[in-house]
Structure formats: structure tokens, C-alpha cells
Amino acid sequence: MMPLAVLQVKRLQPKLITPAKLTPQETKFLSDIDDQEFLRFQVPIIMCYKDNPSLNKNLNPVKVIREALSRALVYYYPLARRLREGPNRKLMVDCNGEGILFIEASADVTLEQLGDKMLPPCPLLEEFLFNFPGSGGIIGCPLVLVQMMTCLTCGGFILALRLNHTMCDAAGLLLFLTAIAEMARGAHAPSILPVWERELLFAPDPPRITCAHHEYEDVIGHSDGSYASSNQSNMVQRSFYFGAKEMRVLRKQIPPHLTSTCSTFDLITACLWKYRTLALNINPKEAVRVSCIVNARGKHNNVRLPLGYYGNAFAFPAAISKAEPLCKNPLGYALELVKKAKATMNEEYLRSVADLLVLRGRPQYSSTGSYLIVSDNTRAGFGDVNFGWGQPVFAGPAKALDLISFYVQHKNNTEDGILVPMCLPSSAMERFQQELERITREPKEDICNNLRSTSQ
């Protein structure tokens, strides 16, 4: 594995990639879900590909993907534009053809040498995704930045991008990446045509809040535990792996009526919420929350949106508890609260969020240390994006974002599992890791039984 100091990346001057054809010059409003304060940040994504001569016929991946990007922008032309604010800070896109920022780079390294440094929290993110001056803002800046780094000694490449989250959620970004990939493989148009129609998620006039939204409520007199005395320099990131063994041990800690009805995501979320709260040493009487980002698309949540809709279409309903019962009760207590919160998500809930954002002047989610937000990216589909070199060896968010953790699919040795990056103050991180190791440790008698069953 390569030491961090050894990697040297050579970058060419950034270029603006514009749509391959003329596109409409117009102004487009974002939806009230897109427009919330919570989404005014840029999210980094990394996609790593091995060389595959049998598929790519020795083509130059930078040239192929850059040209495909330009052609895909004919359909996704708002992504090549810039945001501005209107009255009451309402976001809108000025469709004036400025382009996406594209950086070509190279490094004398192999993907094998990089090893787990490609995984979140990616310690080489600044090398894979250069923060070009003037590109990191929300207003008047490129909505997408792409850096392609070719790994000269192995023929593979790393595509890293940074997306202004007000424009797309994970499902919307996947539609865009899939369109680029299809065109890189020779398609003349995306198989799913993009749909803007952000007015579908505008609040009605007059807006009316019909659901409880704990995720936007402020907690009076919160303490934050060890979060309160921490600054950004004291925050550390670390990833935690949940494989078959960890899930087997956790499932033995929940009551039978929950074993068959809870998902892996539910169980991991309950576990993180409980033991993160313990690690932060939060006041026992304080309310603590965890929000699960829930996609509104699909039959389950019954939100009627076109197939090609690529705007933000999710909510993050919050489970809430006092810290003391959360920490003292068995894991099933947290699990039931997580399941109950997720079950509130439907079309009425999403539209009630839009109404709340308009009525209350676009409130920020609670940003205290007693709050955790989790997003399941294991089924987002980033691992299926094929530009002509096969599927990526890794694809997904590059790191956690303060209070937000992304769950990503990861193969550890021979098994598929879930990797969860977490951001915490350094002292709390040590306690959190110790707690996780303790509660996912398999009892000795179970280890012996598993060895006997394996040898039979």
C-alpha cells in the first residue's frame, strides 16, 4: 500500500465542458424541497475503475467520458449552468451555457497500491478531487466539478466529482451518470430521458403543515456532550464495517418480533444511534435524534413523480428519544423508534416538508451534536455505472459530512458488507469504536459452534 506522501498527481488546467448542442437560454426554479438550507453544500463522490482491454479496445477514458459528458449535458443542460438567488433567497438556475468544470489528471500509481485509501473516509480526497479556487460555493459557481485521474501504471482510472446537492439527490445523480455512461458506450440518447418539472414539489398556496417534523425542531438547552467543546480541527473520521458476523451478533440482541421485520439498514442505524449517544456522553435528560433519509420514489412511498425526475425527492423523518432511555434500554428500543420514524414517510409527509420550509422561512435541520443523519447508499446504483470499462471497484460518497453518515457497499476479503464512515470528536470516536467492538464481538460458544458447523 502506497504511503500518502508518495502520491504525486499531475493536473492539466481545468476546462469548462458545455453541452454538445445549443440548449434553451432560460431561468428554472428549484423545488421547495431542493431549496432548503440543508442541501446547500457540495457532496463528493469517487468512482474507481480497473483497466479492461477486452471491453475498451485501448480507448482513452478521459476523451471518451469527456465527450460523453458534453453530449449528456444536451439533455441535462441545467447542470451546466449556475445558481442565483431571487426574492426571499429562492434558488433558480440561470441557463446560460457556462459549463461543468472538468480537470484531467494523472498519477504514476496503481489502484492496487492505493488499496483502501480509495474508501471513505478517503484520505486522498484532495488529490482525487482538487478544490479549484472559486468552485466550492453554491451561488454563481459550477454545479458539478469532475476530475478524472488516470493511473498510468495499471491503466485504470478514478473519476471523482463534486455535486451541488440542491440540484440532485443520489437517485437523480445516478440518472445523470447513467446517461453519461450510456453515451460513452455509444448510445445516441439516454434510455431514461430527464424530467425537470420541479414545480411538482412546490408548496401549494396557502401551504399547510400536516405532519410532525422533529428533524427541523430546535432542542432547548441542549448540551451536545463532548461535541460542545470540539472544533473542526478536533473532529476525526473513521469507517466501520458491518459484515455477516457483525449483523449476526446484532440480530441476537433484538426481540424475536423485530428479527424478521427489521432491515439491515434499520439495525445498523439503531446501533449507531445508541452507541454514538453513549460515546458523546450527552446529558441523560436531553432529547437526541436520528434521521433516516428516505427516497420518495417508487411504489413503497407512493409519491407520484415521473421516472426521469432528477431533483431532490426525499425526506429525513427523525426518531427522537431522551438520551437516558436510549442508552439504558436494549437495542430493540432504538430499533422500534427507527422503524416507526421511517414508516411515516409517504407523499403527504414529503409535501408537508415543502409546506413547512415555505411557512417557516427555510429552517435548517438541527445542527447539534445530539443529532445524526444517515443515508443508505448501498442500493443507490453507483456500482452499476459502466462507462465501457466494466463496473467500478468502488463507487460512492467519499466521506462523512459532519452529522451525516453514508452507508456504502463494500467487499471485505470474500464477503459483501456495509461500510459506514462516521465523524466525531477524537475522544468520542475512541469510545464509539470500543463500544462497537464490544457489542459486535461474537461470544466464544458461538464461535465454536460456527467452526463445528463449517467443518461438517
Curated annotation (Swiss-Prot):
<protein>
    <recommendedName>
        <fullName>Alcohol acyl transferase 1 allele GSc</fullName>
        <ecNumber>2.3.1.-</ecNumber>
    </recommendedName>
</protein>
<dbReference type="Pfam" id="PF02458">
    <property type="entry name" value="Transferase"/>
</dbReference>
<dbReference type="GO" id="GO:0006066">
    <property type="term" value="P:alcohol metabolic process"/>
</dbReference>
<comment type="similarity">
    <text>Belongs to the plant acyltransferase family.</text>
</comment>
<dbReference type="InterPro" id="IPR023213">
    <property type="entry name" value="CAT-like_dom_sf"/>
</dbReference>
<dbReference type="GO" id="GO:0009836">
    <property type="term" value="P:fruit ripening, climacteric"/>
</dbReference>
<feature type="active site" description="Proton acceptor">
    <location>
        <position position="386"/>
    </location>
</feature>
<dbReference type="InterPro" id="IPR050898">
    <property type="entry name" value="Plant_acyltransferase"/>
</dbReference>
<comment type="function">
    <text>Involved in the biosynthesis of volatile esters which confer ripe apple fruit flavor. Alcohol acyl transferase that can use a wide range of alcohols as substrate to produce esters.</text>
</comment>
<dbReference type="GO" id="GO:0016746">
    <property type="term" value="F:acyltransferase activity"/>
</dbReference>
<keyword id="KW-0808">Transferase</keyword>
<feature type="active site" description="Proton acceptor">
    <location>
        <position position="165"/>
    </location>
</feature>
